[in-house]
C-alpha cells in the first residue's frame, strides 16, 4: 500500500516543483515578516530534501534503465520533450543538491533581516534549476537549465557578495561560463538537424561518424571544461569564491563544479565513445598538469577562500582522471569523490564563513592560536582538514583510492602524478590548519572571538555524519551506482 502510494505521488516533477512553490508563496509575504519568511524557505527546502530521500528509497539499483521517467511535449513541431529521469549516476547529485540548500538558508539565518526574502527565493530557484539539470534527459532542455543556473548565481554573487569587487567577479563568472557553453549549443543544434531529436535515450543508440564525434566532443568539452574547471579556464573560480557570500560558495563548490564532470559522464562519454578514446591522453595530460599546478599555487595563497578554491580545482581534475580511465573503478571513484567534495569543500567554506562573520577578513596572516579561544571550531576544522587530505575513514579516501586504481590500469605515469598531487594536497591542508589554529594567539582581536553557537554546530553535524558514513561504509553509495556505471563502460566498449 505504502509502495503504491509512493509510486503514485512521488515523482521527479513533484521534486522539481517543491522549491518553485516555496518561492511563489514567499512572493506574497512582506519583507517585514522575517520569521515567517525564514520558516517557509526552510520548510520548502527540507520538504524537497525529504522528497529526494523517498526517491532514493524507491530507487531500484539492479537496473541501468532511467527511473521515475516523465515526458511532456515541449515543442510540437520537433521531437523535443520535457523529459525527466534519473539513474545511479545522477541520483546522488540530486540528493546532494537538496541537502545543501537548507544549509544555505540556515547559513544566512542571522542576516536575513538585511538580505530579505529575495535571498531565499534566489536559492530556491537555484535549487529548482540544478535539480532539473541532473534529471533532464533532453539535450536541448538540459542546455537551457544548465545555463539558466547562471542567473540566480549571478544575483547571489553580485548582490550579496562580501567585497567591492563582487560585481566584477559576478560578470567574470557569468561570461566565462556562458561563452564556453555557446559551443555546446551549436553542437546540439547540429545533432538536432542530423537526427531530428534531442532525446538522450535515442541519441545513445545513434552512431555518429568518427569525424562528427570529434567535432561534437570538442564542442561539448569547451562547455564542460569551464564548469569543472580545467586549466587554463579556471581563472573565474577563485575570484567568484572570494567575492561570493558563504552560502554562494557552498553552492559553487558543492554543486556547480559538478555540472562539468556530470556532463562528461552523461553526454560526452556515452554519446561519443570513439572521440572519448581519442581525447583521453589529452584529458589525462591537462588534468595531471592542473593537479600539480593548482596544488603548488595553493601553497602560495594568503586568502582562506582562495586556498579552498584552488584545492577544489585540484580535486575536480583528479575526478576527470578517474572518469577518463573509462573503467568501473575509476568512474565509480570519481562519482564518489564528487559527492565527498560536495560535503568537504562546502564544510570548509562554512568554516571560513564562521571566521569571516567574526572579524570580516579572510587573510591567513590575521589568524593563529584559535585553539585556545575557539576549541569547538578548531576540532571541526581539523576534522574537515583531514577529510580534505583523504584520511582513511573519511569520505574522500575511498573515492581517491578507486580513482588511482582505475588510472593505474590506463596510465601509470598519470596515476603517479595524481598521487603526487594528493601529497601536495596534504601539505597545503596541514599548512592552512597550522597557520589558522596553532601558534600564538594574535593579541589584537582574536581573544574576543566567541566559539561556535548552537546554530553553527547544528549546521556542521550533517556534514560530519555524511563524511563519516561515506568513509566507513561506502558500499551503500557504490551499490546504487554500480549497475549504471557498468552499463556506461559496456555501452562505450571501453572494457
From Swiss-Prot:
GO molecular-function term, one example from the UniProt record: NADH dehydrogenase (ubiquinone) activity
Misc. comment: A stretch of 270 kb of the mitochondrial genome is duplicated within the centromere of chromosome 2 resulting in the duplication of the gene. The expression of the duplicated gene (At2g07717) is not demonstrated. It is also probably not RNA edited and therefore differs in all the positions known to be edited.
Protein name, entry field: NADH-ubiquinone oxidoreductase chain 4
E.C. number(s) listed in UniProt: 7.1.1.2
Entry superkingdom: Eukaryota
GO cellular component assignments: mitochondrial inner membrane; plastid; respiratory chain complex I
GO biological process terms, semicolon-separated: aerobic respiration; ATP synthesis coupled electron transport; electron transport coupled proton transport
Cell location: Mitochondrion inner membrane
Membrane as UniProt keyword: yes
The family this protein is said to belong to: Belongs to the complex I subunit 4 family.
Membrane topology, record value: Multi-pass membrane protein
Keyword entries, A-Z: Electron transport, Membrane, Mitochondrion, Mitochondrion inner membrane, NAD, Respiratory chain, Translocase, Transmembrane, Transmembrane helix, Transport, Ubiquinone
Organism: Arabidopsis thaliana (Mouse-ear cress)
The protein's role, per its UniProt record: Core subunit of the mitochondrial membrane respiratory chain NADH dehydrogenase (Complex I) that is believed to belong to the minimal assembly required for catalysis. Complex I functions in the transfer of electrons from NADH to the respiratory chain. The immediate electron acceptor for the enzyme is believed to be ubiquinone.
Transmembrane segments annotated in the record for this chain: 9-29, 39-59, 89-109, 118-138, 173-193, 214-234, 245-265, 272-292, 335-355, 367-387, 413-433, 457-477
